[in-house]
Amino acid sequence: MANNRYQGTGRRKTSVARVTLVPGSGKFTINKKDISEYFNFDTLRVIAKEALELTNNAESYDVTVNVKGGGYTGQAGAIRHGVARALLEVDPDYRAELKRAGFLTRDPRKKERKKYGLKKARKSPQFSKR
């Protein structure tokens, strides 16, 4: 019996998404909710589905995601990263176009820490000449 489950882990900021692809009709479930119920904004839904759209697999796989940590934008990016990695398990030939689109690269940008003597990470207190 062939294994029809493909898994990938995606990360972005502080979010971690565990993605499972199963051949099906195109259902997209995030934390046991439908994608339209989980993400209120269309832009986030588009980001999450981008890798599937690029490889023309939007209607051929059911996607189940368990995501935690971070905010909605970070979670959408983590889901995209995880879906792209899972698609590589489906067919390694997708690597070139996924890499070109930048979906396989872990986005290293994180929140910069606040430094003492400053208001925020880089914002300094107002300077007074006299």
Swiss-Prot record:
Keywords tagged on the record: Ribonucleoprotein, Ribosomal protein
GO biological process: translation
Molecular function, one GO term: RNA binding
Signal peptide range in chain numbering: none
A single cellular component GO annotation: cytosolic small ribosomal subunit
Region entry Disordered, spans: 102-130
UniProt keyword Cell inner membrane, yes or no: no
Pfam families: Ribosomal_S9
Biased composition (Basic residues): 111-130
PANTHER family (UniProt xref): RIBOSOMAL PROTEIN S9, SMALL RIBOSOMAL SUBUNIT PROTEIN US9M
Record-linked NCBIfam families: PRK00132.1
HAMAP family in the cross-refs: Ribosomal_uS9_B (MF_00532_B)
Family affiliation: Belongs to the universal ribosomal protein uS9 family.
Name of protein: Small ribosomal subunit protein uS9
Organism: Finegoldia magna (strain ATCC 29328 / DSM 20472 / WAL 2508)
This protein's encoding gene: rpsI
